Amino acid sequence: MTAMKKRMILATLSSLLLCMAACSNKQLPTSEDILTEARAVKTLNAYDEMNCVVYDMKVTPASPKSSIDRFVSDDCVEGAGSFEIRYSFSGNSSEAESVYIQQSGGDYRSDLSFHPLGLSIWVKGNKNNKGTFRFMIIQDAGMFTQGTLHDKGRWQFFEYVDKEVLTQEEWTRVVMPYEAFTFVKGHDMGDNKLMLNRFEGYRIEVTNDEGVMCTGSFCIDNLEQLTSYAPEFKGTPKFSSVFIQLDGVYENTDWDKEFKASQEVGIDTWIIQYAEGFNDRAEEKTSFYVPTKLPWVTKQYDIMNRMFEAAKQNGMKLIVGLYPGDYSKKDTASPEQYDFLVERNKQVFDELFALWGNHPCLDGWYITEEFHDGSYPVGWQQEPSLSMLANYLQTVAAYIKSKSPKEVCIAPALWRGMPADLCGEWFGKIFAQTPDIDVLYLQDIGGRCLVDFDVDLPNWFAGIKKACDANGVIFGVDIESFKECWCPKITMRTKPWSELEEQLRVAGMFTDHITNFSWATFKPGTDTYEGYKRYIEGK
């Protein structure tokens, strides 16, 4: 948090008194109480970019002559901008007119149940504005039910009301304790309680309670999830391995030099992401080892051969990835692609095992196909896709184990496609069917501007580790040392060490099996490598 922001918090905290709970005389926490207790904070929306998120912006059926629009303004509390919301009411309706902007869930979702305190949003209005500001939490108590993963008919809306903030001409921080939200509309379950781990999205709604014809505008910025969570870091966690993604550019690499640099920072194990590479634009199917008799390979490199030679000379260990396949992007419940991948992986494994199955530096095997817990473009969130994925993983792992005693690893991506508790249960259902999978290296997706390190990661890590522990799988983390984001647009680059250190310390609270993707953004000369070197030296 910047010094400027801290000053603004002190200067502009809303003095609005919170209402008493409808069902008791218990005093709700004040804004000051919550901010004093808040520790780890996640930005849910910075409102800096117009097109990073898909929004619903609508008028309600009773407001056919009303309007709402949004723009990016350079008047902001933090970051590069804020959203300016402009609205109008006709004043000619038999019911209260209403307009709203809404963001609903999907992948990379938030889970408000993690050490919950409340939400916070900055608002800047105009003294002439008419209308009431209503912030609504949308929840789906039955989300991810088999057959109906998502159903808007189940949505419930719980609102927090501020009748003054739209007329405040200075930036005002509206702090909203969860206890102050009340059920207002949607699916009525009788006992309508806020379930913070079934958060589907939110709506900012303005209602024309006075029934007058008017126009108005206000700005919103920096919607935050406030938690009481303070990470308890353990010692000095270290990387146990590092990934390398092979390519033809490594044809003449001095592996003695690379391995010595790796050992200089205490990393003695490398994971070769895959033994082959496909460049579909050139229609070139590449093998990174020789010899190969696989009919689809058109070009061969001896890169892995030289890596194994150098590994033996330098006391390094190698975990070897197999066929670089991918799952169906259209139908994960169809057996054809799984069957194809099984056969390709068996053939690649057989060649690799013949070359290095008894090599002293071979430390394990890696099934390369990356799955995720999300839904885009298709996923494995429900049956039969879930069990078909598990069966595929087990089939390949069992084939490996029939010939090699070495550990079998996988590295799916954490897309946060489900709430943390359901995500943990989902992984548990997979691992219950994959007894020959030994190690999970969970991609933290920390290089893609899609995750909060100290709110999202501890929550999901805990649930998934529980599933691993229950099924005899080692929980590990695959930390991304690169930075490449779609929104905001950031081209592929190495990240600052300070960011990587936070990821490493968070992972270290849950495991000592911590790998790093990848050597290309962690090699000598990068800020990540040099910073890590100082870190392990205690400097």
State where each predicted segment sits:
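Beta-rich carbohydrate-recognition modules and glycan-binding surfaces
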Residues: 27-235
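Aromatic-lined substrate-binding rim segments of carbohydrate-active enzymes
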Residues: 255-264, 268-326, 385-410, 454-459, ...
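Aromatic-lined carbohydrate-recognition surfaces of secreted/lumenal glycan-active proteins
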Residues: 319-331, 363-370, 392-424, 442-443, ...
